[in-house]
Curated annotation (Swiss-Prot):
Extent of Acidic residues compositional bias: 317-346
Role played: Probable assembly factor of SCF (SKP1-CUL1-F-box protein) E3 ubiquitin ligase complexes that promotes the exchange of the substrate-recognition F-box subunit in SCF complexes, thereby playing a key role in the cellular repertoire of SCF complexes.
Molecular-function annotations in GO: TBP-class protein binding
Any Pfam family the entry gives: HEAT_EZ
Lineage of the species this protein comes from: Eukaryota, Metazoa, Chordata, Craniata, Vertebrata
Record GO biological process: positive regulation of DNA-templated transcription; protein ubiquitination; SCF complex assembly
Protein name (Swiss-Prot/TrEMBL): Cullin-associated NEDD8-dissociated protein 2
Cellular component, GO, one term: cytosol
N-acetylserine: modified positions: 2
Family as reported in the entry's similarity comment: Belongs to the CAND family.
Length: 1236
């Protein structure tokens, strides 16, 4: 017998003792053993433990009973299934015992066992088998109404089972429904309440037929409001419908037109409990079926407005003293009794609370009605801030906060530049409400109730975030409220932290001048909080003090407030926190950060305290725990424009920082490099040379491609040091350059690192005398290309040539006197017949950059060389020469542009390359310098719009787009006219040209483009397929980059867009390829473009979409071509995250095409490509399934549950699903999709 088995055997023996203490201790020890992961019971031990614990459930001692029932939880996952069934059978029998205590213990035991069983989603069938076993016994217990206690326990357990395992119990759903429905008529409230909960869970999991039966039963039982019926019966039915709405509202949509008018009528009956139930049902319907509730929104809004004020027992005075209320006598009849309405009978607060929650659901589910809500709901909510019941007041605040969040304008530069009309109107209305809100909250901010004040702070924080600056004129009221809460030591610390957090937010949203008059009374309580003994308050107060310093005495603006009266106290209280050694880590870090801000912003006013403070920062720099915040604080001090004297700490700080560069901790390295760069910029020649050498010795190891960000900061620092102390670079320039040149040969070089390298190279040759000779640097840069030409080594990546060319140009710009000779040498290399392809490519790319610096010395020769290269057999040489011709031409338009236009006319075979050159010239030249040539270019381009090659037409379109930017107000109307005048290829080219006018950055053409965009979008009705495809690509670009251009047009555009998602049989044809027939769908590219537009709309215009209509077309796409299915799978996944409620309504229809894709088989004998395509389709479909499974209630769908079970039972699908879940966990941010 193993040790564990022997120990358990001895415990079982003790459990038979007559001494209750022995039995209790033995059961407690058994509990400890069962909770160990390592314990394994043999079959005999299992049987004995189960038998003993079931026996102890009937123990005479209650404490032993309770401990035994707790042991069942860990036991059921350690024993075999038949033992679990034995436990469950015994518990079910005990539930029907005559002994009340045993019944109670059995009920608790069943709940414990069910809660510990592994869920069905894990693939274990244990829970399902156990639940099936006890369902029959539970239904019989519920049906026999002899013992209400047994009924209640059984209903509780059944409700719990249905919530966790509703779908696997499908075989019992019909019997459960017929068992539960009669309980709605039970005379006992508790039975009715539990039956309502169980029916809600059943409604979410049952089949469609059973759900219809349930809904019809409930609706048929609902009488008309004038039919005499028991109020209790009506209440129960409405509560049941509300429960069904909450659990399975997505299935109730089809019944709402019949149901909602009845519930509206019942709301008007004089029964507050019934009103509460009706409003709760409306809330559920609005959240789960917002589209179907659309026609009923006006009536529901009216009822909410009526009942949020429903307080028959009180009269709120209308004068300023809103806290004094006056009670009136009133009669209230409830269930045929006529008693005086007293506070004890007052149920009206529940009605008001339900109305407030329903209003919150209204606002969140119908963002399209926001302007109406601002007019109708907002004033009423503001007036109800005076609500006397704390719970109701909290929900009123929540409802107004939901309104604020819906009003929040979309984030990003575009909306900041140009608010959409609707958003601007909403913000304007909200701005008018601000004085009313502040007035309504003035007394609440000093309310005795902590919860009321917390609600005020939350609401005002949201308001400040939506309308920054709007609270400035109300600062006296707000400061008074903040001080009241900061001084409140009688309540919990939470309210003081909330007040500090609110103040911190205000400092970020309101202008600094608003705080100036209040600082004398505001600063003392903040500093008292800094010194508070509770670490969380101290940490929060230090952040506020830091924000005060940053906001009131900004670095780069004149000081509008004299800091002298405050700086001493602020410094003293922060230093006290900084010096303490036994502090919480968070307080230490925030004290260091706060001191960094104090020194950086007000160091010139610290006087004699400055040096001790700096030394204290240096001490924190030595400490491993505080070194990271100390580095950041030192950086703040270094970048300060106050030019503080850092000599007392400089040498030692540099040596410490140098040691950090050796640490294998990325965050530390990045912070250290930022600090070093700041110190080099601010201190320059003051840096001790020996300390600088110690730092520089660590840098070569950091300049490599293993961490590009670290490399970029290291090179930036090198450039700064080169300018500040050139002599320091003498010893390390060799190793550093060696690493930098290796880095420049990386094909993955980011733009930031390249820019840093250019700056460093310019610094090296820009010093006097230069640290490294210009000619030597050029030689080092170009050596890899020339060496490759000699030894025939592996070719460099194309991107490397561009990087090297940029560096050559940077050096030429830093040494203009050398530029001409460099250009001459490059021309020779490009012309030489002995030069390799790589040398020529580098020469042309370098000329493209250097040519604009070198001047006109070699232009004639250069033209000839470039033209000759356009005929090179090497595609890379031709492309580089084309690029160089355009870039050099942009620097000398009078010489090059007429020549380039002549060549385009004269050389039709080289037209594509020459048009690329023209595109580069148009993009690089100044608009004003191009105006004299605009007409000639315009005519030339439109002559080439009808070219046969689509690639050439694409370049022509891009050239037209760049040309329009030269003179938008004149050329954009001309471009629009070409739509009517041109043939199909011309129309397509014009639309593509307009696409190139849209960038992801603000541009002066945007307002003009917006005024014309509707006319360009009319091309969606063009009879030509290619024109419609080009228009969809243009629309997609607008939606993706500048959604405000098209938002106002969506009502007209969306029907046309959806039309393009349909498969058109007249565009499908058969093509014979030898003995085979091949189907060609000419409409595929247009459909694909339409679905790409739909995806982009999800990201930027979600609020303007009718998601139910949108989903109709997504469903069609799920059965379309491979490319479109891939797109719609991604859309389904995104929709599951963005708007789960409407997706849940359609989940049964969405699952079938996903299942079909996941289970599809490739025909035997298919090529490898077909297998790869099918695998990719399966992965994409499974990602969509995984996203659908994140919707909280989706598991209750029978079809989804069936498919989940199919996935688990199929090894291939299970492995795929597991792989996708791992991918999602490791890379959660997969929201965006690159679309061509």
């Amino acid at each position: 017998m193993s040790t564990a088995a022997f120990h358990i055997s001895s415990l079982l023996e003790k459990m038979t003792s007559s001494d209750k203490d022995f039995r209790f201790m033995a059961t407690s020890d058994l509990m400890s053993e069962l909770q160990k992961d390592s314990i394994q019971l043999d079959e005999d031990s299992e049987r004995k433990v189960v038998k003993m614990l079931l026996r102890l459930l009937e123990d005479k001692n209650g404490e032993v009973q309770n401990l035994a029932v707790k042991c069942l939880g860990p036991l059921v996952v350690k024993v075999k299934e038949y033992q679990v069934e034995t436990i469950v059978d015994t518990l079910c029998t005990n539930m029907r015992s005559d002994k009340e205590q045993l019944r109670d213990i059995a009920g608790i035991g069943l709940k414990t066992v069910l809660s510990e069983l592994p869920p069905a989603a894990t693939g274990s069938g244990l829970a399902t088998n156990v639940c099936r076993k006890i369902t029959g016994q539970l239904t019989s217990a519920i049906a026999q109404q002899e013992d209400v206690a047994v009924q209640l326990e059984a209903l509780d357990i059944l409700s719990d089972m249905l919530s966790r395992l509703g779908v696997p119990l499908g075989a019992f759903h019909a019997s459960l429904l017929h068992c539960l429905l009669p309980q709605l008529s039970s005379p006992r409230l508790a039975v009715r309440k539990r039956a309502v909960g169980a029916l809600g869970h059943l409604a979410a999991a049952c089949s469609t037929d059973l759900f219809v039966e349930l809904a019809d039963h409930l609706l048929d039982r609902l009488p008309g409001p004038r039919v005499p019926t028991s109020p209790t019966a009506i209440r129960t039915l409405i509560q049941c419908l509300g429960s069904v709405g909450r659990q399975a509202g997505h299935r109730l949509g089809a019944h709402l037109d019949r149901l909602v008018p009845l519930v509206e009528d019942f709301c008007n009956l004089d029964d507050d409990e019934l009103r509460e139930s009706c409003l709760q049902a409306f809330e559920a319907f609005l959240r789960k079926c917002p589209k179907e509730m659309g026609p009923h929104v006006p009536n529901v809004t009216s009822l909410c407005l009526q009942y949020i004020k429903h307080d028959p027992n009180y009269n709120y005075d209308s004068d300023e003293d809103e806290e004094q209320m006056e009670t009136e006598d009133s009669e209230f009849s409830e269930q045929e009794s006529e008693d005086e309405y007293s506070d004890d009978d007052d149920m009206s607060w529940k009605v008001r609370r339900a109305a407030a929650k329903c209003i919150a659901a209204l606002i969140s589910s119908r963002p399209d009605l926001l302007p109406d809500f601002h007019c109708t709901l907002a004033p009423v909510l503001i007036r109800r801030f005076k609500e006397r019941e704390e719970n109701v007041k909290a929900d009123v605040f929540t409802a107004y906060i939901v309104l604020l969040r819906q009003t929040q304008p979309p984030k990003g530069w575009l909306e900041a530049m140009e608010e959409p009309t609707q958003t601007g109107s909403n913000l304007h209305m909200l701005r008018g409400q601000v004085p009313l809100v502040v007035k309504a909250l003035q007394r609440q901010l000093k309310d005795r109730s902590v919860r009321a004040r917390q609600g005020c702070f939350s609401l005002l924080t949201e308001l400040a975030g939506v309308l920054p600056g709007s609270l400035a004129e109300h600062m006296p009221v707000l400061v008074s409220g903040i001080i009241f809460s900061l001084a409140d030591r009688s309540s919990s610390s939470t309210i003081r932290m909330d007040a500090l957090a609110f103040l911190q937010g205000l400092l970020g949203t309101e202008p600094a001048e608003a705080f100036h008059p209040h600082l004398p009374i505001l600063l003392p309580p903040v500093m008292a909080c800094v010194a508070d003994s509770f670490y969380k308050i101290a940490a929060e107060a230090l952040v506020v003090l830091q924000e005060l310093v940053r906001a009131l005495w900004p670095l780069h603006r004149p000081r509008m407030l004299d800091p002298e009266p405050y700086v001493g106290e602020m410094s003293a209280v922060t230093l006290a926190r900084l010096r303490a050694t036994d502090l919480d880590q968070e307080v230490k870090e925030r004290a260091i950060s706060c001191m960094g801000h104090l020194v950086g912003h007000l160091g010139d006013r610290l006087g004699d305290d400055l040096e001790p403070t700096l030394l204290l920062l240096l001490d924190r720099l030595r400490n491993e725990i505080t070194r990271l915040p100390a580095i950041k604080a030192l950086t703040l001090v270094a970048v300060s424009p106050l030019q503080l004297d850092l000599q007392p700490i400089l040498a030692e700080a540099l040596h410490i920082l140098a040691s950090f560069l050796r640490k294998n901790q990325r965050a530390l390295r990045l912070a250290t490099l930022a600090a070093l760069d700041a110190l080099a910029q601010s201190q320059g020649l003051s840096l001790p040379p020996s300390a600088v050498q110690a730092v520089l010795a660590e840098l070569p190891a950091l300049v490599n491609e293993s961490d590009m960000h670290v490399a970029q900061l290291a090179v930036d620092f090198l450039a700064t040091v080169t300018q500040a102390q050139p002599a320091s670079l003498v010893e390390v320039s060799g190793p550093v350059l060696s690493e930098l040149l290796r880095l420049l040969r990386s094909p993955l070089l980011p733009a930031g690192v390249l820019a840093a390298a250019e700056g460093f190279l310019q610094a090296l040759v820009g010093t006097r005398p230069p640290c490294v000779d210009y000619a030597k640097l050029i030689s080092l840069l170009t050596a890899p290309v020339y060496e490759q030409a000699v030894d025939g080594g592996p070719g460099l990546h194309k991107q490397v040539f561009h990087s090297l060319a940029r560096c050559v140009a940077a050096l030429s710009a830093a040494c203009p006197q050398e530029a001409a000779s460099t250009a001459s040498r490059l021309v020779c290399d490009a012309r030489s017949p002995h030069s390799s392809t790589g040398v020529k490519v580098l020469a042309f790319l370098s000329l493209a950059e250097v040519g604009q610096v070198a001047g006109p010395g070699h232009q004639r020769e250069l033209k000839a060389v470039l033209l000759e290269a356009l005929g090179s057999p090497s595609e890379d040489v031709r492309a580089a020469a084309s690029y160089a011709l355009g870039r050099v031409g942009a620097g000398s338009l009078p010489d090059f542009l007429p020549f380039l236009l002549e060549q385009i006319e004269a050389e039709p075979r080289r037209q594509y390359l020459l048009l690329h050159s023209l595109r580069e010239a148009l993009g690089a030249a100044q608009p004003d310098s191009l105006k004299p040539y605009a007409e000639d270019i315009w005519a030339l381009l439109f002559q080439r719009c009808e070219g046969a090659e689509e690639g050439t037409r694409g370049v022509v379109a891009e050239c037209i787009g760049k040309l329009v930017l030269v003179n938008p107000s004149f050329l954009l109307p001309r471009l629009r006219k070409q739509l009517a005048a041109g043939r199909p290829h011309t129309r397509s080219t014009v639309i593509t040209a307009v696409k190139f006018l849209i960038s992801d950055q603000p541009h002066p053409i945007d307002p003009l483009l917006k005024s014309f965009i509707g006319e360009f979008m009319e091309s969606l009705q063009d009879p030509d397929l290619n024109v419609r495809r080009a228009t969809l690509a243009f629309f997609n670009s607008a939606v993706h980059n500048k959604p405000s251009l098209v938002r106002d047009l969506l009502d007209d555009i969306l029907p046309l867009l959806y039309q393009e998602t349909k498969i058109r049989r007249d565009l499908i044809r058969e093509v014979e390829m030898g003995p085979f027939k091949h189907t060609v769908d000419d409409g595929l590219d247009v459909r694909k473009a339409a679905f790409e537009c739909m995806y982009s709309l999800l990201e930027s215009c979600l609020g303007q979409l009718d998601i139910c209509e949108f989903l109709n077309h997504v469903e069609d796409g799920l059965k379309d071509h491979y490319d479109i299915r891939m797109l719609t799978f991604i859309m389904v996944a995104r929709l599951a995250t963005l708007c789960p409620a409407p997706v849940l309504q359609r989940v049964d229809r969405l699952i079938e095409p996903l299942r079909a894709t996941c289970t599809a088989k490739v025909k035997a004998g298919s090529v490898k490509q077909e297998f790869e395509k099918q695998d990719e389709l399966k992965r994409s479909a499974m990602r969509a399934v995984a996203a659908l499974l994140t919707i909280p209630e989706v598991g209750k769908s029978p079809i989804m549950a069936d498919f989940s079970s199919q996935i688990r039972s199929n090894p291939e699908l299970a492995a795929l699903f597991e792989s996708i879940q791992k991918d999602s966990a490791s890379a959660p941010s997969t929201d965006s999709m690159e679309l061509s």
